[in-house]
């Protein structure tokens, strides 16, 4: 699970309480604890001092942890996977308190059955945001780590895999039921009231995706708290702008290198 205290829109969000006792991060860990196929839960956080609290949380909860790069999350995953000698990685984010362990297990099963390099339920989205599950091999992660260059590919870990179908064998896990795509993640302070209302109304563990949607059917007023004004891929769009700057710089450096080479050739002749 990639975890850090820093956030552009809502710093410290993962340590916000969803009920009287448990934080957002607690919910993530508890939900994943109900998976039948996950072997280990590892916290992948950063080397920043502000994330010392995450390390202490891992220690207090007897969880394995790793500290690495802040923005190069791909490197963080790769170094973490190497440290723990992982063959298969299931990638999760810590801002999704209602991750569904049955969906996680289905994705892992598909990975095992198909022999694919990468299995996900968000290549073509049919699941809510916040139920995202990505499973990939160490070989796929290592190839991505070696070849991915763009800032968006380094920060968001898996875009390089998704974009290169000729290199990786991909499988998209589709939801059999057609449902509205809501966002069940904490991205802004305004999301807290909505997520707390869900937690307050479903007193069971684990909270499954179907439980959340049944609640919306039974108590539609809860959806009045839903903030759908946010650009769902705001962070990724920012990375794409960084990609443009990166490519401009690369192009500029390439032109300089070509000119230098041309000049040296002329002088040598």
Question: Which sequence ranges carry the predicted segments?
Answer:
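Conserved N-terminal catalytic core of the sugar/cofactor nucleotidyltransferase
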Residues: 26-87
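Conserved donor-nucleotide/metal-binding helix-loop-beta segment in metal-dependent transferases, i.e.
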Residues: 79, 84, 100-126
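Short aromatic-hydrophobic micro-motifs that form the base-stacking/packing surface
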Residues: 88-92
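Anionic-ligand binding region
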Residues: 131, 139-164
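Conserved alpha/beta core of the MobA/IspD/sugar-nucleotide pyrophosphorylase nucleotidyltransferase superfamily
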Residues: 136, 157-269
């Amino acid at each position: 699970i990639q975890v850090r205290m820093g956030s552009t829109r809502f710093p410290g969000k993962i340590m916000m309480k969803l009920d009287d006792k448990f934080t957002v991060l607690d919910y993530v860990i508890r939900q994943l604890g109900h998976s039948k196929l996950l072997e280990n839960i590892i916290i992948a956080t950063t080397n920043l001092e502000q994330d010392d609290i995450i390390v202490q949380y891992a220690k207090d909860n007897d969880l394995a942890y790793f500290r690495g790069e802040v923005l190069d999350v791909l490197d963080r995953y790769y170094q973490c996977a190497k440290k723990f000698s992982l063959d298969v990685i299931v990638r999760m984010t810590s801002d999704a308190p209602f991750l569904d362990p049955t969906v996680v297990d289905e994705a892992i099963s598909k990975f095992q059955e198909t022999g694919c390099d990468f299995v996900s339920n968000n290549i073509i989205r049919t699941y809510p945001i916040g139920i995202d599950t990505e499973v990939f091999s160490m070989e796929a992660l290592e190839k991505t780590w070696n070849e991915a260059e763009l800032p968006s590919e380094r920060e968001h870990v898996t875009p390089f895999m998704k974009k290169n179908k000729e290199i990786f064998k991909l499988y998209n896990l589709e939801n059999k039921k057609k449902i509205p795509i809501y966002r069940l993640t904490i991205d802004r302070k305004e999301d807290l009231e909505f997520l707390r209302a869900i937690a307050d109304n479903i007193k069971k563990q684990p909270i499954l995706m179907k439980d959340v949607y049944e609640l919306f059917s039974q108590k539609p007023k809860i959806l009045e708290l839903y903030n759908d004004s946010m650009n769902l891929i705001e962070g990724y769009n920012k990375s794409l702008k960084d990609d443009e700057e990166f490519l401009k710089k690369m192009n500029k450096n390439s032109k300089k290198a070509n000119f230098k080479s041309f000049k040296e050739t002329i002088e040598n002749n």
